[in-house]
A protein has these predicted regions:
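Alpha-helical solenoid repeat scaffolds of the TPR/TPR-like class and their adjacent stem/linker regions
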Residues: 1-444
Length: 444
């Protein structure tokens, strides 16, 4: 048994029970220690998981399975350089093990070793040619490098992963040719940010002569009210009648997206009711003040949120900048970091008043700038044409590429990249310096 386990392997509870029983009988069982580590990793107890794998390696340093399991735990903990060493050791001990090689491939991509990841995918073509996850990893690397033509060839692989909610819909999938009056169903997928990202393509679909049925997340219905769709279909309702269909994230694929031909971001609709609500809450801006919105976490259910998110405390450095006033747009669990009434004197909590993306958009309209770690609010802000400073993890979402401080997808977005050391402190030092300069340029 090697972590991560295929779908037909035992549950975490079964692994934990087996490991405990084995260690009760023989504390010197090296692989039982590693199985304990696998279970601890699944429970999110990463320091203990890493220690358990090391205990196993102390007993048997030549077991490739334990090295690979250790590499996975280190990767989840963000200790990516150490993870690469562990995975390299696993593949050295057993070069022909496809799972060891795949785990190494994933770690290489997440550590930013893109060329190493592509080399591993080439090796896996011979070892495990039917592994669809390899194609998905290869797509992510190619897209990260800006090679959309090659990356999009494998982009459909995501639909065959166990994490994807449905691999296809009934009927004919649209291939991008003129619609000639046919009814096309644009099915939603993934998250809010992805929906905002590719909504820009709906106008191109409409221009190809179709009757467009757009599936939407309820939280986005108001801001996407102005899309040139003929029908709006809420996510979760039974599928409508249609002639052809396409997942929304495949719109850039079939419409031939390149870094030099991207349409402008979607034009969003902000209802008057939301504007009135936010104006009453935020009020008029006093002279000499720079109003800055902040967000420090995306949805905690997102698999890599621990890598892209930080904390409210990290943003407090920005409250030190003269003339800057912070407004929190943070929602859900992480917003509890702002429950302290003294902190609320320094950061105005807007999150509890934001019922949907329309309210958030109305709040952003009243701010001068949004500074945040990556989440759907970055897409929302940039689609509104407002300046957003997006603080991105070492290897971020593929639309942000692998270098530079800008992205062709959003002209008003400025990227502050985490370095290879994955140190947020250094990022916030640069952001604070930039904010000082921004205030000076505005004469504040």
């Amino acid at each position: 048994m090697t972590d991560p386990a295929p779908n037909d392997q035992p549950s975490r509870a079964e692994i934990l029970a087996f490991a405990r029983n084995a260690l009760d009988q023989d504390p010197g069982n090296a692989y039982a220690w590693s199985l304990l580590g696998v279970s601890l990793r699944g429970a999110g107890r990463l320091p203990a998981a890493i220690a358990a794998h090391w205990r196993g390696l102390e007993l048997d340093p030549h077991d490739g399975k334990i090295w690979s399991n250790l590499g996975n735990a280190l990767m989840d903990a963000g200790r990516l350089d150490e993870a690469l060493v562990a995975h390299a050791q696993a593949t050295t001990l057993d070069p022909g093990d496809a799972l060891f090689r795949f785990n190494r491939l994933v770690a290489q991509r997440r550590a930013g070793d893109f060329h190493g990841s592509l080399e591993s995918s080439d090796v896996l073509e011979g070892l495990d040619p039917d592994n669809i996850a390899v194609a998905w990893e290869r797509a992510l690397v190619r897209l990260q490098l800006g090679d959309y033509a090659t990356g999009f060839r494998d982009y459909g692989a995501r639909r065959h992963l166990s994490s994807f909610y449905i691999s296809s819909l009934p009927g004919e999938e649209w291939d991008g040719r003129p619609l000639n009056g046919r009814r096309i169903f644009l099915a939603s997928e993934q998250g809010f940010g992805d929906a905002l990202l590719v909504a820009r393509y709906v106008a191109q679909v409409k221009a190809l002569g179709g009757h467009v049925i757009y599936q939407y997340h309820p939280e986005l219905r108001q801001v996407l009210h102005g899309l040139p769709a003929d029908e709006f279909h809420v996510r979760g309702a039974p599928f409508p009648d249609y002639d052809v269909w396409l997942f929304q994230m495949d719109l850039p694929v079939v419409l031939g997206a390149r870094t030099d031909n991207l349409p402008p971001p979607v034009s969003l609709h902000v209802p008057d009711a939301s504007r009135v609500k936010m104006a009453a809450l935020i009020g008029a801006c006093p002279p000499g003040i720079l109003r800055v919105g902040i967000v420090w976490s995306g949805r905690v259910t997102f698999g890599e949120n621990n890598l892209r998110a930080t904390s409210l405390d990290a943003f407090m450095r920005l409250a030190e900048v003269p003339s800057v006033r912070l407004y929190s747009l943070q929602k859900d669990g992480p917003s509890a970091e702002l429950d302290d009434p003294d902190t609320q004197r320094l950061v105005t909590p807007l999150g509890p008043h934001l019922d949907d993306f329309a309210d958030t958009a109305a709040a952003i309209e009243l701010l001068d700038l949004v500074v945040m770690t990556d989440s759907s609010v970055a897409h929302l802000t940039a689609s509104l044409g407002k300046p957003v400073w997006n603080l991105v993890q070492h290897v971020p979402y593929w639309i942000y590429g692998d270098r530079n401080d800008s992205t062709p997808w959003y002209p008003t977005m400025r990227l502050f990249r985490q370095g290879a050391d994955r140190d947020w402190n250094e990022v916030f030092m640069r952001v604070a310096e930039a904010l000082h300069r921004e205030a000076w340029l505005r004469g504040l």
